[in-house]
Amino acid sequence: ERYAASEELRGVVRDSARRPDAPGLVFSSHDFGGRPPDLARRLGRMRADPAASVLKIAYRARSLRDNLELFDILLERDRPTIALAMGEFGLASRVLAPKFGGFLTFASLSRESVTAPGQPTIEELVGRYRFRSIGPGTRVYGVAGWPVAQSLSPVIHNAGFEAIGHDGVYLPMPIAADESAPDASYASFKATVLAMMEHPRLDLSGLSVTIPHKQNLVRLAREQGWRLDPLSSLCGSANTLAISPSAEGPSASRSAAVFNTDARAAVECLRGVGVVPKGLHVGLIGAGGVAGAIGFALALGGASLTIFNRSAEAARNLADRISRETGATANRREQKFQVSLDIK
């Protein structure tokens, strides 16, 4: 702002920039408080100054959607440009900078030496996210939930992508939610997922969806007319969104399919130790999205259930739904059972 307000300072800078041996100048705008309301004006002013060799825009992201605007700034660049989002929502802008032609990104030597909120370490950027392998064609995946910083999914999936030679990167994607405002949480989830899917160059190809958005994923799938696997439709909870590229080009609408793999994984684990659901009495501890999906899958496989939960009402509601939809015996009365599953 001082530079913009002082003609004298601008004159000194321009005179210096005209020298044959003058280094290039980086014109930078930082806002640690959030997206500046005059972002377009700031960017236009920097672009109009011939003394600027490199432009840099950085601000604290309010949501994942702020990354998309920064990607557009990179795509519209008229000279080398750095566009980064700070904070917990901004990692995508840092990792995906080479996908959109960013001049550079920043990383710290250690977690203790970060110079901006949300900055990854070099080990995370180069090792976990394989920064040097990211290019325009890299497909983007992520784990969506609130919170997701603790998730090991990026470590597992990125290692898998490297092992099979897949040009993809898997990121933590926090989407804010509030238990006391479910409709607002759904609106946040819907707006974020659709905006990422519709971005013409992001190439979002899939999401693992975790708490508290598993029910929101099913609700969104029904609204959008996406393919919904039978178990997700039955239990009202899903954890996987697979997105197909459009045959009509990147800007066309894209098809999607929604699945629940929680239940299949649990049943396969039981089968792996010789336990089959048919005729089994199962004590199910938990009544959330994962527990519900597993309960439905076991009931469909012929098991009977006793459901335990801190909330008696939640346990009763899940038991009633399973009994009504599958015809299996599901209750919350204590009884002898052969297998107990504690679903945290």
Which functions belong to the PLM regions below?
Residues 303-326:
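NAD(P)-binding Rossmann-fold cofactor-contacting core
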Residues 138-275:
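Phosphate/diphosphate ligand-binding glycine-rich loop within oxidoreductases
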Residues 31-32, 61-63, 85-91, 110-113, ...:
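Glycine-rich beta-alpha junction loops
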Residues 26, 56, 82, 142, ...:
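A structural signal for isolated positions on well-ordered beta-strands in alpha/beta enzyme cores
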Residues 326-344:
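Short acidic low-complexity segments
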Residues 42, 152-163, 289, 293, ...:
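Short, solvent-exposed amphipathic alpha-helices that sit
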Residues 4-139:
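Catalytic alpha/beta core domains of metabolic enzymes, predominantly
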Residues 85, 140-149, 258-263, 270-302, ...:
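Glycine-rich adenosine-cofactor-binding loop
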